[in-house]
Curated annotation (Swiss-Prot):
Record-level GO cellular component terms: cytosol
Name the UniProt record assigns to this protein: Dihydroorotase
Listed HAMAP family: PyrC_classII
Subunit composition and interactions: Homodimer.
Phylogenetic classification of the source organism: Bacteria, Pseudomonadati, Pseudomonadota, Gammaproteobacteria, Vibrionales
Length: 342
């Protein structure tokens, strides 16, 4: 197959950052996506509906397309209230709230210290139909970084699913076979996003032959057996799994340093990267469901009505891309992509 036409895709998990870099991140995310769910871990974090609407306006100021629409999310803290959830839902622009365990990832220091503290908030979310997005890692120092996801599933997420059976939950950027099994076995209100980089790479790519800082992300890349489980889930056609890039830009100097930031930038070629994975798995026919159908179906939103076309046509990814007054090194920098969006 050299040409593939699919319903216009959406990205259900992306970081655009804020300020002058929006000119670059919005350009990339809006190129062919219909919608993108914008993560709220900016500085300061987006903790109220007013902040979410103001952030949306800043994003829209750089949107040069007609088809793209940003969807907003709230950042949950120990101090989030049920009233704030109801207010956010009523705004019409905020579709989800994000649970970051405190310290789990970039700009998550304001996150939730104990999930029991936000049980009244989760109850309100269940009542009004607001989705819960979860960064599924524990942050206690006695848990190995490669085991954080599994421990979170057992100790934190399983009780939430049991206590709030009608709450729609998205386990974001899953990285383990354990997460795949958890989502498959959970009730119909539990789904997951999978990133392109966790499908394409494993920890060997990051660590063998020298440390590759641009592969460093959180949750961290796991061993290849987990990678294979993710590929199987993503390409299976199972409606519980859908596209969320977790594209997370950092300036080159912040990545290539003695204490580098976590995050990989993939928004420049997201659906093209996924197409390679699906082609290698012999499942290109399932790309449309993963990229364009399963996400809006789970969120209770209409599918996009128009299409995009991918063609098998190699093109070079630049060594770096503009990022405000700095540069970002994208995934596949200096290499060729196999698929291109016409």
């Amino acid at each position: 197959m050299t040409t593939l036409t699919i319903t216009r895709p959406d990205d259900w998990h992306v970081h655009l950052r804020d300020g002058e870099v929006l000119a670059d991140t919005v350009r990339d995310i809006s190129r062919y996506n219909g919608r993108a769910l914008i993560m709220p871990n900016t500085v300061p974090p987006v903790t109220t509906s007013e902040m979410a609407l103001a952030y949306r306006d800043r994003i829209q100021a750089h949107n040069q397309t007609e088809q793209f629409s940003p969807l907003m999310s709230l950042y949950l803290t120990d101090n989030t209230t049920a009233d704030e959830v109801r207010k956010a839902k009523a705004s019409g622009a905020v579709v989800a709230a994000k649970l970051y365990p405190a310290g789990a990832t970039t700009n998550s220091d304001s996150g939730v210290t104990d999930v029991k503290k936000i049980y009244p908030v989760l109850q309100a979310m269940q009542e009004v139909g607001m989705l819960l997005l979860v960064h599924g890692e524990v942050t206690t120092h006695d848990v190995d970084i490669f085991d954080r996801e599994k421990t979170f599933l057992d100790n934190v997420l399983a009780p939430i699913v049991q206590d709030f059976p009608d709450l729609k939950i998205v386990l974001e950027h899953i990285t383990t076979s354990d997460a795949v099994v958890f989502v498959k076995n959970a009730n119909e209100n539990v789904a997951a996003t999978i990133t392109a980089h966790h499908l394409l790479y494993n920890r060997n790519h990051m660590l063998v032959g020298g440390i590759k800082p641009h592969f460093y992300c959180l949750p961290i890349l796991k061993r290849n057996t987990h990678q294979l489980a993710l590929i199987s889930a993503a390409t299976s056609g199972n409606k519980k799994f859908f596209l969320g890039t977790d594209s997370a830009p950092h300036a080159k100097g912040a990545k290539e340093s003695a204490c580098g930031c976590a995050g990989s930038y993939t928004a420049h070629a997201a659906v093209e990267l996924y197409a390679e994975v699906f082609e290698q798995a012999g499942k290109l026919e399932n790309l449309e469901a993963f990229a364009s159908h399963n996400g809006p179906d789970f969120y209770g939103l209409p599918r996009n009505q128009d299409t995009i076309t991918l063609v098998k046509d190699a093109w070079p990814v630049p060594a770096s891309m503009p990022f405000g007054g700095d540069i970002v090194v994208p995934i596949r920098a200096g290499e060729n992509m196999e698929w291109k969006v016409k």
